[in-house]
Amino acid sequence: MGREFGNLTRMRHVISYSLSPFEQRAHPHVFTKGIPNVLRRFRESFFRVAPQFVVFYLIYTWGTEEFERSKRKNPAAYENDK
């Protein structure tokens, strides 16, 4: 054993690179590249996703209205009862 945690085994042919936490920036290019990229991705995927949501919303509203209508009694069925 004798090795410290993190260096428990020696791995051959594996190269890893790392930066010191003091050399890294927390959020590089968030405002210059990140937000425009989010807007671009939204525009690209909007017309693929939006029609499905519209169809789902129309079917859902139709289904709830039809359900509420079917719960009511039909007054024409009780006109001749006395």
From Swiss-Prot:
<keyword id="KW-0999">Mitochondrion inner membrane</keyword>
<dbReference type="GO" id="GO:0045275">
    <property type="term" value="C:respiratory chain complex III"/>
</dbReference>
<dbReference type="InterPro" id="IPR036642">
    <property type="entry name" value="Cyt_bc1_su8_sf"/>
</dbReference>
<keyword id="KW-0249">Electron transport</keyword>
<comment type="subunit">
    <text>Component of the ubiquinol-cytochrome c oxidoreductase (cytochrome b-c1 complex, complex III, CIII), a multisubunit enzyme composed of 11 subunits. The complex is composed of 3 respiratory subunits cytochrome b, cytochrome c1 and Rieske protein UQCRFS1, 2 core protein subunits UQCRC1/QCR1 and UQCRC2/QCR2, and 6 low-molecular weight protein subunits UQCRH/QCR6, UQCRB/QCR7, UQCRQ/QCR8, UQCR10/QCR9, UQCR11/QCR10 and subunit 9, the cleavage product of Rieske protein UQCRFS1.</text>
</comment>
<comment type="similarity">
    <text>Belongs to the UQCRQ/QCR8 family.</text>
</comment>
<feature type="topological domain" description="Mitochondrial matrix">
    <location>
        <begin position="1"/>
        <end position="39"/>
    </location>
</feature>
<keyword id="KW-0813">Transport</keyword>
<dbReference type="Pfam" id="PF02939">
    <property type="entry name" value="UcrQ"/>
</dbReference>
<keyword id="KW-1133">Transmembrane helix</keyword>
<keyword id="KW-0496">Mitochondrion</keyword>
<feature type="modified residue" description="N6-acetyllysine; alternate">
    <location>
        <position position="33"/>
    </location>
</feature>
<feature type="modified residue" description="Phosphoserine">
    <location>
        <position position="16"/>
    </location>
</feature>
<dbReference type="InterPro" id="IPR004205">
    <property type="entry name" value="Cyt_bc1_su8"/>
</dbReference>
<keyword id="KW-0472">Membrane</keyword>
<feature type="modified residue" description="N6-succinyllysine; alternate">
    <location>
        <position position="33"/>
    </location>
</feature>
<keyword id="KW-0597">Phosphoprotein</keyword>
<keyword id="KW-0679">Respiratory chain</keyword>
<dbReference type="GO" id="GO:0005743">
    <property type="term" value="C:mitochondrial inner membrane"/>
</dbReference>
<keyword id="KW-0007">Acetylation</keyword>
<feature type="transmembrane region" description="Helical">
    <location>
        <begin position="40"/>
        <end position="68"/>
    </location>
</feature>
<protein>
    <recommendedName>
        <fullName>Cytochrome b-c1 complex subunit 8</fullName>
    </recommendedName>
</protein>
<keyword id="KW-0812">Transmembrane</keyword>
<comment type="function">
    <text>Component of the ubiquinol-cytochrome c oxidoreductase, a multisubunit transmembrane complex that is part of the mitochondrial electron transport chain which drives oxidative phosphorylation.</text>
</comment>
<feature type="topological domain" description="Mitochondrial intermembrane">
    <location>
        <begin position="69"/>
        <end position="82"/>
    </location>
</feature>
<dbReference type="GO" id="GO:0006122">
    <property type="term" value="P:mitochondrial electron transport, ubiquinol to cytochrome c"/>
</dbReference>
